[in-house]
UniProtKB/Swiss-Prot annotation:
Residues 351-401 are annotated as: Disordered. Signal peptide: none annotated. PROSITE patterns: RIBOSOMAL_L1E (PS00939). Residues 351-373, 386-401 have a biased composition (Basic and acidic residues). This is Large ribosomal subunit protein uL4B. One of its GO terms (cellular component) is cytosolic large ribosomal subunit. One of its GO terms (biological process) is translation. The keyword Cytoplasm applies. Keywords: Cytoplasm, Ribonucleoprotein, Ribosomal protein.
Length: 401
């Protein structure tokens, strides 16, 4: 597959109706090198899609076609208006409110809503340029799901003879010769019934998108291709973003006729000259002409403008408690170590003095006993007395014998 060389070659081959190169080459238009901006494409696509909407609204009378009156307070029910009368389930039910069954909706829709959106012409052209540039990158085309594994080249350009086709069988044969029929097979395989209520609104079936055929003059090409499912036909002078980027996503597979491909430089111009067919229009410029950021930053021009790097590292100071950390306390109070050492020595001297204190013969004052200790001592004394009396009684008994 030759698609890996896309956008790298300055010349694009023109293919004949037999799927072979015709020997002619076309210069790659500058629009295919325009910046690809998916954000702009998505924004413009969203706003253009809104211009196809049809105004709708609910009836002004909806929810109010009944006689209902509030019962007021004092009935232990909500003050919502209630249907009058009796003899039916409807009587007494709430009415009018958006919380009621059969009531009107909240903020009923009106036909004078702001349906349409205005988009800047330059912004629309920027989006089309981005979509065209993306259609020349095989990776983006394949990411959209197009089957282009076997096609000879991207972008794919065919001879102008194709514009005079009038029969669908000729168009089918051309697609098969160009190896693009796999993309049509994908469309056939994707045809299915729509989910939801669109089935009731003339939108029963849905299918995937196929190739987009872009021509310069309609000499019968529309009749030849229009009945093939998935095919979209566009005039190169009236390129539509809704067709080039379906769903707001870039990467549509495009098949160009030779004259349409050559006309792109006149339509969008190059960076050296403005467009001939659009007044005062120039191609959007890239924000970066060189994508090698490392090379740009290390260039002499950038380095000369930059100041020298500041290598001074400022570390965060760790705060410590001087009452717990002696080293920090000594920094604040150099005498702290001496005072602490003096206190320790004084404590040792007091301990030694207590140990060496002589006994002067005076009876030491006894500590007063608490009630519990007194009871224990009294119980022990009674036990000793009982034991002594028992021994005395035994001794007397032995003597009498």
């Amino acid at each position: 597959m030759a698609v890996s060389m896309a956008c790298a070659r300055p010349l694009i081959s023109v293919y004949s109706e037999k799927g072979e190169t015709s020997g002619k080459n076309v210069t790659m238009p500058a629009v295919f090198k325009a910046p690809i901006r998916p954000d702009i494409v998505n924004f413009v696509h969203t706003n253009l899609r809104k211009n196809n909407r049809q105004p709708y609204a609910v009836s002004k009378l909806a929810g109010h076609q009944t006689s209902a009156e509030s019962w007021g307070t004092g009935r232990a029910v909500a003050r919502i208006p209630r249907v009058r009368g009796g003899g039916t389930h409807r009587s007494g039910q709430g009415a009018f409110g958006n919380m009621c069954r059969g009531g009107r909706m909240f903020a009923p829709t009106k036909t004078w809503r702001r349906w349409h959106r205005r988009v800047n012409t330059t912004q629309k052209r920027y989006a089309v340029c981005s979509a065209l540039a993306a259609s020349a990158l095989p990776a983006l085309i394949m990411s959209k799901g197009h089957r282009i594994e076997e096609i000879p080249e991207v972008p794919l350009v065919v001879e102008d003879k194709v514009e005079s086709y009038k029969k669908t069988k000729e168009a089918v044969l051309l697609l098969k010769k160009l190896k693009a029929w796999n993309d049509i097979k994908k469309v056939y395989a994707s045809q299915r019934m729509r989910a939801g209520k669109g089935k009731m609104r003339n939108r029963r079936r849905i299918q995937r998108r196929g190739p987009c055929v872009i021509y310069n003059e309609n000499n019968g090409i529309i009749k030849a291709f229009r009945n093939i499912p998935g095919i979209t036909l566009l005039n190169v002078s009236k390129l539509n973003l809704l067709r080039l980027a379906p769903g707001g996503h870039v990467g549509r597979f495009c098949i160009w006729t030779e004259s349409a491909f050559r006309k792109l430089d006149d339509l969008y111009g190059t960076w050296r000259k403005s467009a001939k067919l659009k007044a005062d229009y120039n191609l959007p410029m890239h924000k970066m002409t060189n994508t090698d950021l490392t090379r740009i930053l290390k260039s002499q021009e950038i380095q000369r403008a930059l100041r020298a790097p500041n290598k001074k590292v400022k570390r965060r100071e760790l705060k410590k408690n001087p009452l717990k950390n002696l080293r920090i306390m000594m920094r604040l109070n150099p005498y702290a170590k001496t005072a602490r050492r003096h206190a320790i020595l004084q404590q040792l001297e007091n301990i030694k003095a207590k140990e060496k204190k002589p006994d002067d013969g005076k009876p030491k004052a006894k500590k007063p006993l608490d009630a519990k200790t007194k009871m224990i001592k009294l119980a022990k004394a009674k036990k000793r007395q009982a034991r002594a009396e028992a021994k005395t009684a035994e001794a007397k008994t032995a003597e009498s014998k």
